[in-house]
Each structure stands twice: as C-alpha cells, then as structure tokens.
C-alpha cells in the first residue's frame, strides 16, 4: 500500500542509516542485505513484483529487481546499493546519519548513490502503475564500487530487454552517453637473488622491470597516436604506472619486482585487443627471459561505453532537460546494462562529491529529479 511508504526524507534517512560498504579488504566489506530488504519491502508496498538475486563470488551480496507492467520493452531505472569506505578522521558528521544544513543533505551515499532510490520511490507514490502500457523496472545492484559484480552477473543472467535504461549516478542531472573503460594489471618479474658483490650469479628483477617499463611506455605512445575520440577532454586512451615494489636490501640482487598499471580504453576498443597490445609490447622481454614475466588482472576489466547519439533515449532526454549529452572519464555500470538496451547515465548530485568526506547532495536537485523521473516514466511506459 502506498500509504505505508514513509515520507521522502525518511526514506532517504533509512537508506543512509543502513551500512552497505563494499571493499576489497574483507575487514571493511559489508553485506548489502539490509538495504536490499528495505528497498524490496518498499517496492512491494508500491505494488511491484520483487526478485532478490544472490550475487555469486561475493560476501553475501544481492541484486534486487522490482518490476511492474506487462509486455516487452519499457524502462529500466538502475543504481548501485553500495558505498565506498569512509575515513572517520576526515568526516565532521556521522556518515550514517542524514543531516540537512544550508541546502545540503549530508551522509555516506547521499550522492553516490543511495539517494537515487529515495527519489524513485517518492516519485512513484504519485504514479498509478496499473495504467502503465509498458513495463517499468528498478534494478539495485551490488559491489559497483569494487568489482561491479552485481551488474556483471545481472547482465549475464537476465532475459530482460527494456527499450532503454537510465543509471542514476551523480551527474548533476547532465546526461552522460559515453565513458572510458578501465583495465588494471599486475606486471610481475621473477629474478634470481644473490649477493650484490657478484651480479653474474643472479638475475636482477628490477633491471628486467626497467626494460619492461620502457616497452610499456612505448605502448602508451602508440595508444595516444593510434586512437582518438575528440569528445573526451583527454581524447586518447591513457596508460598509468601507479605502483611499483621490488627488492628488500641494497646488498641483495632483487628476486622479484611488481608493477601495477592501468589503461583507460575508449568506447569501441575491445579488451581482447588491448590485452593483445600489452602482451605484444612485453614480448621482447618475455622472449629474452622466458618464464620470468607474467601479467595478471588486478580487477575484472570494464569496457568503454557509448550510447548511440541518435538514439531515441538521447533525443528524449536532451529535449526534456534542454541540454546536450556529455562524455566523461570515470566508469559506471553502463557497459554492462548497455548489453541489454541503450543506456544513459543521469542522476542528481555532483560526481565531485563521490567518495569525499562529508559527502552531500544539494536540495536544489530534489524538484527537478522528481520531475525528470516522472517524465521519463510517462514517455517510455505510457506511450
């Protein structure tokens, strides 16, 4: 029953008060079961059918799909339920208590992105879902902030094929139709230790890594020269050497050296092609030192994403908002949802607040976000 649904600010408050941190470090990682239960109960109260999906390979994480309406097509509104960990020493407020001050709603997940579900629920209390001519789906996913396991698994297992989808990440209500992907790898070189007084009796892993880095930097130049997408502020794939460690003493030949690096591919670049380019770049080192160099994934890769600029979803949203779509450098779940249907990233709050101490969402987004959700439901589910 709709009258059981709490007021907007109380929905928001309950979502923020329910911890759902995702982290690679097990001690910090939390289940999102409590948040999924909250959302499932509220959508059931609104008359939706609700399915809760365990996500394999996670620490008790779940997706939730709420659906209403019959037939094919329709609209999918999607978002993730998890937040990043917080630095207690840098927050001046309780991260799990929603507080309002000076036109801002503070709390962990207010912008990124629990708030989007509060907006959806509050908007739907004024929508007669029994009159929808096409289905409306609400997807809440797990582990976006780490592996994107929830969106990956959902996209691999669902038969759902909506007409289009909107992911409510904080974009300041500016529609995003493309972003780069992310590949992160560990390059590991195994040498042979020995006393530094006799270098010929060992194989110095740092020296081999120095050689490997030279080839990787040549690959960086190749990517910059070969691939371009002028809509991006950085219009080429970037390659970054982010972390290196090797050796344990000045008087020992280094036995192991490890490098962490990432590549941000443009939309349209396949992950297989990029991995092939990396292996090709490192081939001279591998051939000279067989069995001593390995490449492993640090995290599951995320492909680049693009919604066709001439798709109806882009045209409708640009008309509703009176603005043009943008492209961004950060990653979202859009590449996985895009395998189901054309997808835009569009939601309240600023990306500049994501992962920040004293995270907040400005209250000026409340009215236009409600209006936008109402308008897209009307357009894609009532016509």
UniProtKB/Swiss-Prot annotation:
Chief location of this protein within or outside the cell: cytoplasm
Binding residues annotated for Zn(2+) 1, in chain numbering: 80, 112, 169
SUPFAM superfamilies: Bacterial exopeptidase dimerisation domain (SSF55031), Zn-dependent exopeptidases (SSF53187)
Cofactor note: Binds 2 Zn(2+) or Co(2+) ions per subunit.
Keywords: Amino-acid biosynthesis, Arginine biosynthesis, Cobalt, Cytoplasm, Hydrolase, Metal-binding, Zinc
Function (record text): Catalyzes the hydrolysis of the amide bond of N(2)-acetylated L-amino acids. Cleaves the acetyl group from N-acetyl-L-ornithine to form L-ornithine, an intermediate in L-arginine biosynthesis pathway, and a branchpoint in the synthesis of polyamines.
Protein's UniProt name: Acetylornithine deacetylase
């Amino acid at each position: 029953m709709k009258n059981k649904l709490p007021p907007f600010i109380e929905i928001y408050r309950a979502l923020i008060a329910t911890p759902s941190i995702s982290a690679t470090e097990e001690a910090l990682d939390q289940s999102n079961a409590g948040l999924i239960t909250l959302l499932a109960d509220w959508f059931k109260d609104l008359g939706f059918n609700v399915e809760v999906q365990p996500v394999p390979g996670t620490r008790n994480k779940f997706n939730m799909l709420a659906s209403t309406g019959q037939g094919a097509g329709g609209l999918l509104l999607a978002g993730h339920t998890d937040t990043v960990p917080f630095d207690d020493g840098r927050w001046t407020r309780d991260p799990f208590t929603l507080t309002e001050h000076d036109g801002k709603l503070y709390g962990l997940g207010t912008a990124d992105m629990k708030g989007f579900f509060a907006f959806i629920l509050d908007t739907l209390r004024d929508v007669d879902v029994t009159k929808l001519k096409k289905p409306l789906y609400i997807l809440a996913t797990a582990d976006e902030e780490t592996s994107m396991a929830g969106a990956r698994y959902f996209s691999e297992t669902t038969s759902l094929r909506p007409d289009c989808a909107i992911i409510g990440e904080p974009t300041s209500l500016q529609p995003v139709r493309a972003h780069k992907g992310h590949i992160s790898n560990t390059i590991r070189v195994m040498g042979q230790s020995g006393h530094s007084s006799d270098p010929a009796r060992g194989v110095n892993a740092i020296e081999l890594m120095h050689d490997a880095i030279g080839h990787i930097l040549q690959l960086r130049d190749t990517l910059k020269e070969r691939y371009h997408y002028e809509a991006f502020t950085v219009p080429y794939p970037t390659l970054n050497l982010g972390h290196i460690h090797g050796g344990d003493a000045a008087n020992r030949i280094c036995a192991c050296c490890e490098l962490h690096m990432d590549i941000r591919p443009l939309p349209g670049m396949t992950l297989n092609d990029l991995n092939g380019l990396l292996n090709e770049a490192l081939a001279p080192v591998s051939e000279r030192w067989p069995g001593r160099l390995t490449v492993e994934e640090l995290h599951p890769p995320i492909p680049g994403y693009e919604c066709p600029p001439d798709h109806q979803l882009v045209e409708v949203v640009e008309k509703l908002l009176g603005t043009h779509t943008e492209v961004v450098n950060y990653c979202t779940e859009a590449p996985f949802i895009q395998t189901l249907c054309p997808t835009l990233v569009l939601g309240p709050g600023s990306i500049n607040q994501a992962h920040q101490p004293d995270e907040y969402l400005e209250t000026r987004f409340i009215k236009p976000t409600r209006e936008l959700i109402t308008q897209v439901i009307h357009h894609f589910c009532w016509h």
